[in-house]
Amino acid sequence: MFSLQDICRKHLFLLPSSFDEYILQALGLYWEKHGSLQRIRKDAVFVQRNIVLSTNEALRIAASEGNERVIKLLLSWEGDFHYVIIGALEGDRYDLIHKYVSQIKDYHNILSLIQNANTFEKCHHLSNSNMWCLIQNAIKYNMLSILQKHKNCLTHEGENQELFEMACEEQKYDIVLWIGQTLMVNEPESIFDTALARIDFSLLTIGYRLLFDNKMSCIDIHDEEDLTSSLTEHLEKAAIKGCFFFMLETLKHGGNVNMAVLSKAVEYNHRKILDYFIRRQKCLSREEIEKLLLSGISNGASIKTLNLLLSYLNYSVKHIIRKIVQYVIKEGDFTIIVVLKRKKINLVEPVLSGFMDDYYSYCFIKQFIDEFDIRPEKIIKMAARKGKLNMIIEFFNEIYPHKDDLKTMFKFLKNLVYTMKHKKGKEVLIGLIHKIYQSIHLENKEMFNLLKFYVMYNANIQFIALCKDCFKLAGFKPFLLECLDIAIKRNYPDIIQNIKLLLKYE
């Protein structure tokens, strides 16, 4: 049970100025060698009425002195018992540690609170872990002096590489530099990958410092070609990430901002990089900018990126229109067509034609149709000219999904044939019209009209097939004579011959 005195001590935040040393000792609010002790807020104490300490700092000092009474008081003031362990280690009070050992789940949890390397190592020793674990934790908590102390143990290149990469990941710059300059490491150039992955400029500069201190055997700084190649590779990776300042730092040491580098900036839509090197530095010719534009089409660059590249060309693309169309058709990304159409450069029709030629699915082409609001008759006529009957059927299934719509399709197609000039295209549509006819019911007059339609467009096969259906209809012979007149006027010998045969058997 708590005494009334304990409760008062725990919650008393203001000491009367009249309390002398004797009363403070009686209340348990006196700290030997330090003076009065009072709580001023949840995480701080007042010592001798003029020194403010955090509760945990006071706890550490008390533990280093072995003052269990003050420790107990500070713990009641919400101090962290981990600082008891830290203070006890500083003062070599292992008996005190033994009293609190049951509350400690893992000594590694205390390491982050320790500032002193000697105390850090003592604490780690209590966990009964090995030297490798100590070194890893020393990196994690930036204890360079521990690595320096145990340098003679760090002789394995593979393990040193792991430590180097860990230091880079943890962004412990002093340790990174020390390992790079002091220990044998397999792949010190991995620092550049980490710097780019984390977008860490400090790590990048350390990497170049190590490189030009000749600490990277994989790159010969005295071989200009090898150095330029490596630095250009860094520029390319930086362009992918959009790390503009990384590129400027790299260029201080060498490398070339070439087409491969800027193509990555286009692919990943890093316009700041493009604007700096193309507009300000003027490092590309018009032909190279055109190639970048085509690269952007290939890699699905955004509207803003494509607009930027087009602006460098003053939106003049006459010389590469054919290539633009080819790239769009090949890659299936028509963003550039949207951009150009806004600038009154219309490439919709040649691209649509190319999509049909390359057997793009109707689902894809439908996106294109919707984007540019293309009229259905234009799509069907183009598909008919190319003999893409399946695509026409898919299109009709999309806009006329019900069987009741077949008559509407029938009339629509007949009207298209009236306005179409392309002979092969007409044949495709007439073939489809006849298929629809076989699935719908027509009145006698409508069948005769269809027969006349076939004669007008010299559709001999469909004409013969329909004649078989009309043979027994009243008025068929007079109508055949009318059809014969049309065939003679238009000089359709096959239909003329077939009509004459039919008239013989009538």
Curated annotation (Swiss-Prot):
InterPro entries: MGF_505. Pfam families: DUF249. Keywords: Early protein. It comes from the Viruses. Induction: Expressed in the early phase of the viral replicative cycle. Belongs to the asfivirus MGF 505 family. Plays a role in virus cell tropism, and may be required for efficient virus replication in macrophages. This is Protein MGF 505-4R. The lineage of its organism: Viruses, Varidnaviria, Bamfordvirae, Nucleocytoviricota, Pokkesviricetes.
